[in-house]
Amino acid sequence: MAKLFFLISGEFESLSFSELKAILEVEGYAYTVTEKLDQTVRLEADSESIKQVHRRSAYTRICAQELFTCPANGNAITKAANSTDFKSIIDEGATFEVRIRRIKEYSTKDATMTLERQLGKLILQNAKHAKVNLTKPDKTFIGILTNNKLVFGQKLAEIQPKPFVERRPRKKPFFHPSAMNSKLARCMVNLAYARENACLLDPFCGTGTTLIEAALIGTRAIGIDVQRRMANGAKQNLKHFSLNPEAIVMADARKLPLTHVDCVVTDPPYGRSATTLKSSTKTIVDGVLTSVRELLGKGQRICIASPKTIGIKTIGVKLGYRHLESHFAYVHRTLTREVAVFEKT
């Protein structure tokens, strides 16, 4: 197994960490977490696993092969860099750059730039055949300053934010103010252990955000909504991204016209802009957890979001699910979402 590290989002850090682990697990990669730092996860796993993290993750930013980790002081960094065989890493005549990311207040901007230059010089002393290229290098070395440490290695993949930005609710042809953002939806798809070619259900599909994120990683997506307008809008949005859902059906989430699915991801309606058909959010959550239970096999997962005040963990456990984890995502002053993951027992 290779020594790897991942720079994860600080937006919802616990979600980011759980998403990374879920991707490795659902794709069948054994791993050992060696250290969890602020926005940085060090672990040992097959380096091939990075391809799946890059393909699937919403909240991972950079994937890298670790070369060294040391205290974030000049002497320790110089010693660690001088002990690293850069000449065997950089091919003859190849170019490289060094980039340093600072997390929170663990460093200053000036210190970060100074460290980039310092490490560049140390690498050139070791690999005299190499050249620096800051615009289009053959290799990028990335360092993360966090928790008074420098985690340093070769960048293998970077997840660009632009595709997720292009799939924001207001960028889609059919918009509704209650729609979830694409990053959180993708993360929930991953937490539900959605596999390629597996069947994922969103019984409150709304504008189709979850269906889009599931389809983009090769999952067969089924959407259900009680409103014809929303079901048609979801179809319109998937078509906009050239995606074909398994099915989008107008039906009541409490009376699902299905016999089996592999996982469930959903964000039931709540708030002033959502249509709850005169039912309380707690009643809706209870109803959908009851109905989807009949569709899932033992060990299969549901990832569901609801207002923190609902107490979704208690509802799920009372209905016989095993509660695996919960995360809390602040939305605005009157709403903090609880993202809960359950397993059918």
Q: What residue ranges belong to the model's regions?
A:
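Class I S-adenosyl-L-methionine-dependent methyltransferase catalytic core
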Residues: 1-62, 69, 76-83, 103-115, ...
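Phosphate-coordination loops involved in phosphoryl transfer and adenosine-cofactor binding
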Residues: 92-95, 197
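Short secondary-structure capping/junction motifs at helix and strand boundaries
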Residues: 95-97, 124-136
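A broadly conserved amphipathic alpha-helix scaffold signal in soluble, globular proteins
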Residues: 117-124, 190
